[in-house]
Amino acid sequence: GGVINIITRESDDPWNLNLNSRFSEHNDQRYGGTVGFNAGKFNSLTNVQYNNVDTYAVDNPGDFSTVFGSRVWNFKERLIYHPLETLKLTGRAGYYFRERNKPGDTQDRYRGFSGGMKANYTFNIMSNLEVGYTFDQYDKSDYQSLYKNDVRDYSNVQHNVHALYNYTFNGKHTLTVGADYLRDYLMSYQFTDNADHTMHTADAFGQFDWNPTERLNVIAGLRFDYFSDSNVRHLSPHLGMMYKIGNCSLRGSYSQGFRSPTLKEMYMVFNMANMMMIYGNPDLKSETSHNFSVSAEYTKNRYNFSVTGYYNLVHNRINTVYSEDPKGQIYTNTDKMDIAGIDANISAKYPCGLGYRLSYTYIHEFMHDGQKKFTDTRPHTATVSVD
């Protein structure tokens, strides 16, 4: 189990304070507090949490019968400043630390650092602009308690800059354009000699949301992606339509999917618990797909019914396959494959507060002659929930 605190809403109170604690078996202790203030143009919210749990054994014969204890610190701060009625500035920062106890003189340590700045400017009721920068770093290290050495063997550092602009025509048509830049640095024990690699990615996109009538909605978009390490440039279009007839909504869409190989998929050389080796492949191609879908949704009073059908054509899917040279699992591009499926849902909500939902999913992967199946996806899935 875990606790996630997401700071999303500004407080209207001048001051607020929340303190909490929890105790459970295995000496599991959690202490936390949140303090915030709202003073004129400033709004601040600070959250601190500490968690500690002892090592304990579980009734599970075999190699994995012990759950190691740990201690965790988590700090978060968000500060909002309104210098103008039309301008909002947001800053945030966070720090995460976890130390896991295990036998011997070495402890596992995990650290996370995050921060960001964002500006939202409203030109008028028709247009607004958002620009921002975020920083994220996640480290793993081995703490040698006898020598008091903290040896870092994994570090992922990301710098991201983004911009987003919206303009509304005639109060009902919206144009959205934006761009992102990401610098991704990764040093890992999963690379040969703890090597490091850096990749730069950039994208630019545009989308137009057109509403010619109250019944018809059309969304068209185009996205350009660039990845430095694999030197890939790619355009991805998207087109979607919705038409309303009474209580029924009909939808259809086409989109082109795209995914460039990650640094791990290209450069990993990793011994998986002495069971097998996993190797990256710097010659991987980008994974692409063409995705088609149609759906119908009917809503009346407290009842809702929807059905969706889709067909995806996937090219160069990135997966691991067994290799004799080098011996182990290696990332590779698999053969072209097609995937089709149907999703159906029925739900209802009654005045007494009771509701239910029935869902059914069917997936079929079209395999060509001699093609290996790399996934164990269940063709039929059904769920029933009552709340």
Residue ranges and their predicted role:
Residues N211-V218, Y298-T299, S306-V314, T332-D387:
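Gram-negative outer-membrane beta-barrel transporters
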Residues G2, W15-L17, Q29-G33, W73-E77, ...:
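Hydrophobic, lipid-facing positions within transmembrane beta-strands of outer-membrane proteins
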